[in-house]
């Protein structure tokens, strides 16, 4: 594939009959515009790289692909564009063959690396959406870095034909000293083959991947709506027995990810908390909460799930018990009762791991409660069934909640990928269509149109860093902070 370079603009064989000579004064406005584009491209991509380096929130696996794309775009803006402008001004190449080969190599390598970076970014988003939980274990910075290095290695393979084409051919190509062009500029089969491998095939695969991503996200959203419509929402779940007395919902209920807490009441008929003789650190048996006629948990505090384990529930005396085991964590008391040890927010990874630890203890426990109030007994079928039901529901909703968080993030990432792909295709496809036409019809080249398609492809490197803050709130905030822009 002849990735964008301006050699065709001056190649008599490729553009013969349509070539026009432009005077330098006429070129100056165009040179100013193109130079501005080059400077903006360099500045924006440097801003992206600095933002990722300086902001910890941007240190993610997915942004490694963005860094790769930004490096490729930076090379286009800092090396390829300026030398193209210089070649356009001179109307002939007078900088020598070594510098010509360097420019051609940077042009082909950077443009291919940009295409491949978008491609592997698309694959990453596809696997994140299609296999979220499985791919999370596989999706590491080491593997992502290896994939990126592989993409750049394939891109650098362009150096072989650029520098050594004549070494692989018996016939030596005629080289024009005042032109900067590859030795295979007139080899149709090679250019068509590489165009298919480097652009058309990756583009078709990316469109297929993105269609799958779109369908998966859409299907997940429909599934979530169906679940939310048929089951109580995650925030509405309460640990309570299914009896008529406990059906009335109390105002001000808090999140289900909070551990049970009841204040003792002076008057009868209220709930009673049996205070253990040991401190929470010293407790070896579960802390048991008793509850009277209302049959409903008063308050839940945010605990990591691995310290919460459901025990058997006593039957009789209109009480229901929920036990909290401390085998995996320490509880901290305050004047109001039990509180958390500072876990107000549960991360996605914690929930994935903790949901496995949220389970019923293996052994039955018998514990005395307040005098005259009843006893916690093993073998309570009704209570045990309720505990099992509650555990299954909490586990199911925790997984749905984690899956929802992950899919929410991936939906935003898919949106970002959609904009990147749209810009990529719109900017590059005119050049490659025109390129295929020229490959089969050497007299069909129009100098001005071909130059326009080349620079349209280059402008893709300018647009990419503008897309990131539009689709990513962290990029937007970081850009504003770096540029000292107030919201």
Curated annotation (Swiss-Prot):
SMART domains: 7TM_GPCR_Srsx. Residues 51-64, 124-144, 212-416, 470-487 are cytoplasmic. Residues 238-286, 345-379 are annotated as: Disordered. Glycans are attached at residues 5, 18. Residues 107-112, 424-428 are annotated as: Important for agonist binding. Disulfide bonds join 100-180, 441-444. GO terms for biological process: cellular response to histamine; chemical synaptic transmission; G protein-coupled receptor signaling pathway; G protein-coupled receptor signaling pathway, coupled to cyclic nucleotide second messenger; positive regulation of vasoconstriction; regulation of vascular permeability. The keyword Hydrolase does not apply. It is a multi-pass membrane protein. Histamine binds at residues 107, 112, 198, 431. GO terms for molecular function: G protein-coupled serotonin receptor activity; histamine receptor activity; neurotransmitter receptor activity. Residues 1-29, 90-97, 165-188, 441-446 are extracellular. The modification Phosphoserine is found at residues 230, 344, 347, 380, 396, 398. The keyword Transmembrane applies. Residues 353-369 have a biased composition (Polar residues). GO terms for cellular component: dendrite; plasma membrane; synapse. Residues 238-261 have a biased composition (Basic and acidic residues). It is found in: Cell membrane. Keywords: Cell membrane, Disulfide bond, G-protein coupled receptor, Glycoprotein, Membrane, Phosphoprotein, Receptor, Transducer, Transmembrane, Transmembrane helix. InterPro entries: GPCR_Rhodpsn (IPR000276), GPCR_Rhodpsn_7TM (IPR017452), Histamine_H1_rcpt (IPR000921). Its main location: membrane. The modification Phosphothreonine is found at residues 140, 142, 279. Phosphorylation at sites in the second and third cytoplasmic loops independently contribute to agonist-induced receptor down-regulation. Belongs to the G-protein coupled receptor 1 family. This is Histamine H1 receptor. The gene is HRH1.
């Amino acid at each position: 594939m002849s990735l964008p370079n301006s050699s065709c603009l001056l190649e008599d064989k490729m553009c013969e009959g349509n070539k026009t000579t432009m005077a330098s004064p006429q070129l100056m406005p165009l040179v100013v515009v193109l130079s501005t584009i080059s400077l903006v491209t360099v500045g924006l991509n440097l801003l992206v790289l600095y933002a990722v380096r300086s902001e910890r929130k941007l240190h993610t696996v997915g942004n490694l692909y963005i860094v790769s794309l930004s490096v490729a775009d930076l090379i286009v803006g800092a090396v390829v564009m300026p030398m193209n402008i210089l070649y356009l001004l001179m109307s002939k190449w007078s900088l020598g063959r070594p510098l010509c080969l360097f420019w051609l190599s940077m042009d082909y390598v950077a443009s291919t690396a940009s295409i491949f970076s978008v491609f592997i970014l698309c694959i990453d988003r596809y696997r994140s959406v299609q296999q979220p939980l499985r791919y999370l274990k596989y999706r590491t910075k080491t593997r992502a870095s290896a994939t990126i290095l592989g993409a750049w290695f394939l891109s650098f393979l362009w150096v072989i034909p650029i520098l050594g084409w004549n070494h692989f051919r018996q016939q030596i190509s005629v080289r024009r000293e005042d032109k900067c062009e590859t030795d295979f500029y007139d080899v149709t089969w090679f250019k068509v083959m590489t165009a298919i491998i480097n652009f058309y095939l990756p583009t078709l695969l990316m469109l297929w991947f993105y269609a799958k991503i779109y369908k998966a996200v859409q299907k997940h959203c429909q599934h979530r709506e169906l679940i939310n419509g048929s089951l109580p929402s995650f925030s509405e779940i309460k640990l309570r027995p299914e009896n008529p007395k406990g059906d009335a919902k109390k105002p001000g209920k808090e999140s289900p990810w909070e551990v049970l807490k009841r204040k003792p009441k002076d008057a009868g008929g209220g709930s009673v908390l049996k205070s253990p003789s040991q401190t929470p650190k010293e407790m070896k048996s579960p802390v048991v909460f008793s509850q009277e006629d209302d049959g409903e948990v008063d308050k839940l505090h945010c605990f990591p799930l691995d310290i919460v384990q459901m025990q058997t529930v006593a039957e009789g005396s209109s009480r229901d018990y929920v036990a909290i085991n401390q085998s995996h964590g320490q509880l901290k008391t305050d004047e109001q009762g039990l509180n958390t040890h500072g876990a107000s927010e549960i991360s996605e990874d914690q929930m994935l791991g903790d949901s496995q630890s949220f389970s019923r203890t293996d052994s039955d426990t018998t514990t005395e409660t307040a005098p005259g109030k009843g006893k916690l007994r093993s073998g309570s079928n009704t209570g045990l069934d309720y505990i099992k039901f509650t555990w299954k529901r909490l586990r199911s909703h925790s997984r749905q909640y984690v899956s929802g968080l992950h899919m929410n993030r991936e939906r935003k990432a898919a949106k970002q990928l959609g904009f990147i792909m749209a810009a990529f295709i719109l900017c590059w496809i005119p050049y490659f269509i025109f390129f295929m036409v020229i490959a089969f019809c050497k007299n069909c080249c129009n100098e001005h149109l071909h130059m326009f398609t080349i620079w349209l492809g280059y402008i893709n490197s300018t647009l990419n860093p503008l897309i990131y803050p539009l689709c990513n709130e962290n990029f937007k905030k970081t850009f504003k902070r770096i540029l000292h822009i107030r919201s």
